[in-house]
């Protein structure tokens, strides 16, 4: 069973709260982000999350219209850059301070709603 975004967020919070793990994992993650190169294509981290599951589809529907258009523009521009085998100019790269999780709150909200729906669907009533 794949991990939920809620469990991944909890693991991330645990790592950041633990000083030893934070000293090890944060520099490694920064290097990973640097070498992955998605910021050089103008993408943010949340643009990389696969859209093919119902939770993500629900989260994308809840995304504000302006942010949704910006997301689609970033993805189309990145595809165009890949097709032409060129990176964006350095001034158009996404900076670290601009790469904030804009979609994660909606994903966590959609997961909570799906879990609540599943719990209610599997509810068993008993007589006392």
Curated annotation (Swiss-Prot):
One of its GO terms (biological process) is mitochondrial electron transport, ubiquinol to cytochrome c. Its main location: mitochondrion. GO terms for cellular component: matrix side of mitochondrial inner membrane; respiratory chain complex III. One of its GO terms (molecular function) is ubiquinol-cytochrome-c reductase activity. It is a peripheral membrane protein. It comes from the Eukaryota. Pfam families: UCR_14kD. It is found in: Mitochondrion inner membrane. InterPro entries: QCR7, QCR7_sf. Keywords: Electron transport, Membrane, Mitochondrion, Mitochondrion inner membrane, Respiratory chain, Transport. PANTHER family: CYTOCHROME B-C1 COMPLEX SUBUNIT 7, UBIQUINOL-CYTOCHROME C REDUCTASE COMPLEX 14 KD PROTEIN. Component of the ubiquinol-cytochrome c oxidoreductase, a multisubunit transmembrane complex that is part of the mitochondrial electron transport chain which drives oxidative phosphorylation. Component of the ubiquinol-cytochrome c oxidoreductase (cytochrome b-c1 complex, complex III, CIII), a multisubunit enzyme composed of 3 respiratory subunits cytochrome b, cytochrome c1 and Rieske protein, 2 core protein subunits, and additional low-molecular weight protein subunits. The complex exists as an obligatory dimer and forms supercomplexes (SCs) in the inner mitochondrial membrane with cytochrome c oxidase (complex IV, CIV). Belongs to the UQCRB/QCR7 family. This is Cytochrome b-c1 complex subunit 7. It comes from Candida glabrata (strain ATCC 2001 / BCRC 20586 / JCM 3761 / NBRC 0622 / NRRL Y-65 / CBS 138) (Yeast).
């Amino acid at each position: 069973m794949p991990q939920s975004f809620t469990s991944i967020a909890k693991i991330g919070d645990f790592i950041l709260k633990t000083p030893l793990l934070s000293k090890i994992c944060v520099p490694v993650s920064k290097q990973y982000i640097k070498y992955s190169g998605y910021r050089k294509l103008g993408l943010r981290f949340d643009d990389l999350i696969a859209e093919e599951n119902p939770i993500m589809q629900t989260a994308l529907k809840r995304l504000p219209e302006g942010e949704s258009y910006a997301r689609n523009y970033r993805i189309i521009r990145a595809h165009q850059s890949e097709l032409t085998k060129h990176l964006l100019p350095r001034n158009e790269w996404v900076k670290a301070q601009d790469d904030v999780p804009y979609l994660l709150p909606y994903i966590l909200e959609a997961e909570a709603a799906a879990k609540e729906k599943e719990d209610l669907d599997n509810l068993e009533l008993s007589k006392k």
